[in-house]
Amino acid sequence: LPVLLRGLRDTVSDLAAVVTVADDGGSSGRLRQELGVAPPGDVRNCLVALAGRKRLAEVFDYRFEAGEELRDHAVGNIIIAALADMAGSFEEGVGQAARFLRIKGRVYPAATESLTLVVRYADGTTTRGESVVHKVGKQVSAVAVEPGGLPAPDAVISAIDRADIVALSPGSLFTSTIPSLLGGGVAEALARFDGPVVYVANVMTQAGETSGFSVSEHVRAISDHIGPVATDILVHSGDLSDDLLARYERENAAPTVVDREALERMGVRVREADLLSDDESRGVRHDPAKLAAEVRRLALVRL
């Protein structure tokens, strides 16, 4: 999501991001456990992506490298936790952080309190917690959140209702994308939305979580959880280098197969474009400008 936000921030006048609060690992997990605050890490990443005050954004992203208590904590996570505690509301704390950073857009947590991810695997077993999924390494079949039935914040529903286009960004399908859509009222808001709902397909599968998944299986997983909301699919069209493929093969990941006929049978339009960064040093990464340009193009075509 931050990659897409960085691409859109200077070209879209009214930008809103909805961010999962099911993270329970790393700095976010420690703050969640010790302070009872909703995990701020994913929210922080989106705030930083939209920040107008670049130096302050660098402070938010700074991580302590020493000290038993502060090691690996992101400064921004601590600030958001403090603001939420002072305001008595995680949602308001995020809003205050957004004003500090002078973000270009709005960032909304998908829920007003911490959620716990409940994961069901293809073999019928279940685990609780987002951070254990990749350690388990088994094929995921479905996820839910606890407590269940919580309504999404009113601001989230309002943002969907007012949108010209909704983009489901690339990322971990079962531990990031789908959990952000499970708040009460979100599925209904997307079902009545009459604009394009664009799913930006992951270029690579993830070991265990989506091993062997095609693009249509990603879309079907979203549909199984909230209904058939996607109208358009955006996929990368270029080839990957042999070195890059070998690097991901060692991680039990492979390119996501674009099964166009299956997608068209599901009633979704497929758009292929060059979406990746030319810099392969950090692996397969979407290019913010390329990705944003294609999302904007889809919005213009469909409006």
Regions found by a protein language model. Name each.
Residues 167-169, 198-200, 234:
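Structural motif
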